[in-house]
Amino acid sequence: VYNQTTAVLGCVISGFYPDSVQVSWKKDRVDQSGVVLHSKQRNDSTFETVSYLTVPVVEWTTGDVYTCEVSHAGSRFNDRISMRYQKGGTINLPVPGGNTPCTCPPCSCSGCMPKLVYQTDLNVTLENGGQLQYNCHQQACKIK
């Protein structure tokens, strides 16, 4: 949630080469108009980028499913990750540094560090089973 009226949903795509990735957004299978930022080259010569979709908080909190779809022709990679508002939030994230898209509903990602407006505590379960706990206040989270 970016502010009291707008939510920003994020999709971080990293570890792809060459620099050519397609990202699309859907709300309950209907195309949405998201933004894909310019890719940055990483130290290992692969690339990463961020795509985001802004939606009214009223729509985000109704429980509709939003999906970030990613395809990379160079590696034949195709994947999607769906997100839905979760009050009080326990969420699942890929392991940081992995090659899969990273999202963290109901928040935005900046290096997979959740930044929230309303929640005060957040439990994160990584795909490898690891657990992280965050204490969130004033739109920022710190690991407990």
Curated annotation (Swiss-Prot):
Residues 87-144 are annotated as: Secretory tail. InterPro entries: Ig-like_dom, Ig-like_dom_sf, Ig-like_fold, Ig/MHC_CS, Ig_C1-set, Immune_Resp_Modulators. Keywords: Adaptive immunity, Disulfide bond, Glycoprotein, Immunity, Immunoglobulin, Secreted. Disulfide bonds join C11-C68. It is found in: Secreted. GO terms for biological process: adaptive immune response. GO terms for cellular component: extracellular region; immunoglobulin complex. SMART domains: IGc1. It comes from the Eukaryota. The keyword Kinase does not apply. Residues 1-82 form the Ig-like domain. Expressed mainly in lymphoid tissues including spleen, epigonal organ and circulating lymphocytes. Pfam families: C1-set. Its main location: secreted. PROSITE patterns: IG_LIKE, IG_MHC. This is IgW chain C region, secreted form 1/3. It comes from Heterodontus francisci.
